[in-house]
């Protein structure tokens, strides 16, 4: 018998949504050269927005126009910001290779023959930075051959475009090839909002949400509030687009954007390039925002034209009123930032909202004992790897070279795409970086997501790195909890590489040239777009054929077909144990680490061995050490969870504020469910993670009174009661039984709607999908 499992279809819906192909409804301008039969939806959007405006009788923000323009039932949909659940029809789905594995495994499990909307897979997360671009790429292709083959064949069979390893980072590829003003895109990566730089609503989701959209099921989103950020003045000197979002993070903090779309407007918008706007939208993920967006303007027109999409730019220009906010549109909150007076910022360490203006950084560093010597400077990532970013950084490196200086730190450059890499090589920027002492890494995420084989410091050694990345959680980049990571612009990162010091202020401080003379760096200069046009480089796209075989070996340690989670048995969840009570920040990195664990993203059982590895146990202040409340023995968190599961003991986890902050990885929800968890009880959730938990049949619950967190002991037995009358808006009750026999009753809130309650009852959203499809046959 063949040792490979051949995947067959289980069921299928009665019909599929047309891919924007009706000329009577859709404009006949293709959305991408890679999808010539899918067309811009502006006429349909206009019609739907008119229906909604006639109902609401008020001006709309840009966010509302795009979102409501994609409503499944615009005539009847309840629309109330922060209250209603919207049922939406996104234009497309994008998946990166680490999350696409589980998304495609779930889609295959659904039994459907083809995706219902244009979709793509992008290979960017599984390439480790070690020796440099070409060598690292070759090594990654060899190590991940099985996974890349699975994604390529699954994409080909089910109608999903496949961007090969080396093509670039998902968000840069989307910006270059697929994003357009008015787009509604969902992507299985938290930095999907990058596409807002071209005027689209691009939203990070878990893989199960992507499966819904690919299966032609309306996508649900709680109607977001809208935070308006008015930009006045102009960017100038050392101040860059990155500083706008670093300042916003300072104002709103890591959870200030939760449940809201951040919409930029005002005269200052016109001084920012399209890729700069992408940078700002990208890091909106760090404030918990649903997404971020800019109005259509000439910067977007120029970028679309430069990337071979002039037809789209012209069509968008015709619909500019649709692609900008109405006069008098109402925002739930307005923040004003004057770009004339904005200064460069450096945020960190350990959190992206701890902001220091460049003139205060040295003082703050000395006061807090942050290491002043910078060990590594890293530019690039999905946040800052555009041609403009590279030209500005190169202009600073060139000044140093002209004075006989090179980088004092290790210096790495991550191009965002093959197109950016080929273009900066052609235009001589790569040579400047090489002469400066820099190493150009592969077109991939690399150190930004922890794919970095760092050798210059030992684990536990206190040190500082400066990056143009987006996140700097503890251990995020190099798995060293003692590394102090600071996030800033590529300009400031490069300047600090020259000085080697965190307290260096390039606006005021002097450097010593090779000949002993003193000099100051001049403000960076850059080009929004390459004067000679973009060089596309190597062709790295595989179009789907609609046929082929997808194989998953049962002996694989990288890929594993999914088994359905068990249904709810109709009873209250009684006498559960507390696996861990987490104290402090608990991001998706703490729940399901990335880095070396990325290789197991397609194998649920194996990756579950990283559950809560770096979360701090409130009981003992330690990581990965919890007490088995049945045996009394201490052990690793995953091993303890497995023991509970083997013994038929269900468990919960207790958490603090903004639980699940960070990435969209649904493994942070799948793993607790796989290892026997039934509920996560916290003070508050990050949006994407809360939805991911619901999708997997878990109960994400919040304390009605956050102070009740302090009443809970890790040794308590937990019962969640009232599930027989589980209903939207109706709190549940938890009873915590102490070791002395006393009980504490706690009210728990939830955000489940009726459909999500059906997910819980079925055991998962995927189980519920199969039930619905089976009934429709």
Swiss-Prot record:
InterPro entries: Acnase/IPM_dHydase_lsu_aba_1/3 (IPR015931), Acoase/IPM_deHydtase_lsu_aba (IPR001030), Aconitase/3IPM_dehydase_swvl (IPR015928), Aconitase/IPM_isomerase (IPR050926), Aconitase_4Fe-4S_BS (IPR018136), Aconitase_4Fe-4S_dom (IPR036008), Aconitase_dom2 (IPR015932), Aconitase_mito-like (IPR006248)
GO MF, any single term: 4 iron, 4 sulfur cluster binding
CC cofactor note: Binds 1 [4Fe-4S] cluster per subunit.
Record GO cellular component, one term: cytosol
Leading EC class: lyase
A biological process term (GO) from this entry: tricarboxylic acid cycle
Biased composition (Polar residues): 542-555
Cofactors (names): [4Fe-4S] cluster
Region annotated Disordered, chain positions: 534-555
Protein's pathway: Carbohydrate metabolism; tricarboxylic acid cycle; isocitrate from oxaloacetate: step 2/2
Record keyword Mitochondrion present: yes
Reaction equations catalysed: citrate = D-threo-isocitrate
Matches recorded under Gene3D superfamilies: Aconitase, Domain 2, Aconitase, domain 3, Aconitase, domain 4
Record has Lyase as a keyword: yes
Extent of the transit peptide: 1-26
Protein keywords: 4Fe-4S, Iron, Iron-sulfur, Lyase, Metal-binding, Mitochondrion, Transit peptide, Tricarboxylic acid cycle
Binding site for [4Fe-4S] cluster: 382, 445, 448
Binding positions for substrate per the UniProt entry: 96, 189-191, 471, 476, 601, 664-665
EC number(s) from the headed UniProt entry: 4.2.1.3
Subunit-level organization: Monomer.
NCBIfam families: aconitase_mito, PRK07229.1
Described purpose of this protein according to its UniProt entry: Catalyzes the isomerization of citrate to isocitrate via cis-aconitate.
Protein name: Probable aconitate hydratase, mitochondrial
Organism (species): Caenorhabditis elegans
């Amino acid at each position: 018998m063949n040792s490979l499992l051949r995947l067959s279809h289980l069921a299928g819906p009665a019909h599929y949504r047309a891919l924007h192909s009706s000329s009577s409804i859709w404009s006949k301008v293709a959305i991408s050269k890679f999808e010539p039969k899918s067309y811009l939806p502006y006429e349909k959007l206009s019609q739907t927005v008119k229906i909604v405006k006639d109902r609401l009788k008020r001006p709309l923000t840009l966010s509302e126009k795009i979102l409501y323009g994609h409503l499944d039932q615009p005539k009847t949909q309840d629309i109330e910001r922060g209250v209603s659940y919207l049922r939406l029809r996104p234009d497309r789905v994008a998946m990166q290779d680490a999350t696409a594995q589980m998304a495609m495994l779930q889609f295959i499990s659904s039994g459907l023959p083809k995706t219902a909307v244009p979709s793509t897979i992008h290979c960017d997360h599984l390439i480790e930075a070690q020796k440099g671009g070409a060598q690292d790429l070759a090594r990654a292709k060899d190590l991940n051959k099985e996974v890349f083959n699975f994604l390529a064949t699954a994409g080909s069979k089910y109608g999903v475009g496949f961007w090969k390893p080396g093509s670039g980072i998902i968000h840069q590829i989307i910006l270059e090839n697929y994003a357009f003003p008015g787009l509604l895109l969902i992507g299985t990566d938290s930095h999907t909002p990058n596409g807002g730089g071209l005027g689209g609503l691009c939203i990070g989701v878990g893989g199960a949400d992507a499966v819904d959209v690919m299966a032609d099921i309306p996508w649900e989103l709680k109607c977001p509030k809208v935070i308006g950020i008015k930009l006045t003045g102009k960017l100038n000197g050392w101040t860059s687009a990155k500083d706008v979002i670093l300042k916003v993070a300072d104002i709103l903090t890591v959870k200030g954007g939760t449940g809201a779309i951040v919409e930029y407007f005002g005269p200052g918008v016109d001084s920012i390039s399209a890729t700069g706007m992408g940078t700002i939208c990208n890091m909106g993920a760090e404030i918990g925002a649903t997404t971020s967006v800019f109005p259509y303007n000439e910067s977007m027109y120029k970028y679309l034209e430069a990337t071979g999409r002039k037809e789209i730019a012209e069509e968008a220009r015709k619909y500019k009123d649709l692609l900008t906010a109405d006069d008098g549109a109402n925002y739930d909150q307005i923040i004003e930032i004057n770009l004339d007076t904005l200064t460069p910022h450096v945020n960190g360490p350990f959190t992206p909202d701890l902001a220091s203006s460049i003139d205060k950084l040295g003082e703050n560093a000395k006061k807090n004992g942050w290491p002043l010597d910078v060990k590594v400077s890293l530019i690039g990532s999905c946040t800052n790897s555009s041609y403009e970013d590279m030209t500005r950084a190169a202009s600073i490196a060139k000044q140093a070279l002209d004075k006989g200086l090179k980088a004092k730190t290790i210096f790495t450059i991550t191009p965002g795409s093959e197109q950016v890499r080929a273009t900066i090589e052609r235009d001589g920027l790569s040579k400047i970086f090489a002469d400066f002492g820099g190493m150009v890494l592969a077109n991939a995420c690399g150190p930004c997501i922890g794919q970095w084989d760092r050798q210059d410091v030992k684990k536990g050694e206190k040190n500082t790195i400066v990056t143009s990345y987006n996140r700097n959680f503890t251990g995020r980049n190099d798995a060293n909890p003692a590394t102090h990571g600071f996030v800033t612009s590529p300009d400031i990162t490069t300047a600090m590489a020259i000085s080697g010091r965190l307290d260096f202020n390039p606006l005021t401080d002097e450097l010593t040239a090779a000949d002993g003379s003193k000099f100051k760096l001049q403000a960076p200069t850059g080009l929004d777009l390459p004067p000679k046009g973009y060089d596309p480089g190597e062709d790295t796209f595989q179009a789907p054929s609609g046929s082929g075989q997808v194989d998953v070996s049962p002996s694989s340690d990288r890929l594993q077909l999914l088994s359905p989670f068990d249904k709810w048995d109709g009873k209250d969840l009684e006498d559960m144990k507390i696996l861990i009570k987490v104290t402090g920040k608990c991001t998706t990195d703490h729940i399901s680490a990335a880095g070396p664990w990325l290789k197991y993203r397609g194998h649920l059982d194996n990756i579950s061995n990283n559950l809560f590895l770096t979360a701090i146990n409130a009981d003992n202040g330690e990581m990965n050490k919890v007490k088995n409340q049945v045996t009394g023995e201490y052990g690793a968190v995953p091993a303890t969870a497995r023991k509970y599961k083997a013994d038929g003991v269900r468990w919960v986890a207790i958490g603090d504020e903004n639980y699940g902050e960070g990435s969209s990885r649904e493994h942070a929800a799948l793993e607790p469910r796989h290892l026997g968890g039934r509920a996560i009880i916290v003070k508050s959730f990050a949006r994407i993670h809360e939805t991911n938990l619901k999708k997997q049949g878990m109960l994400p619950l919040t304390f009605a009174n956050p102070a009740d967190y302090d009443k809970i002991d890790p040794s308590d037995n937990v019962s969640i009661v009232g599930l027989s009358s589980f209903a939207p808006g109706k709190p549940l009750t938890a009873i915590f039984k102490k070791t002395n026999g006393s009980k504490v009753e706690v009210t728990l809130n939830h955000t489940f709607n009726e459909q999500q309650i059906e997910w819980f009852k079925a055991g998962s959203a995927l189980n519920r999908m199969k039930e619905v499809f089976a009934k429709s046959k």
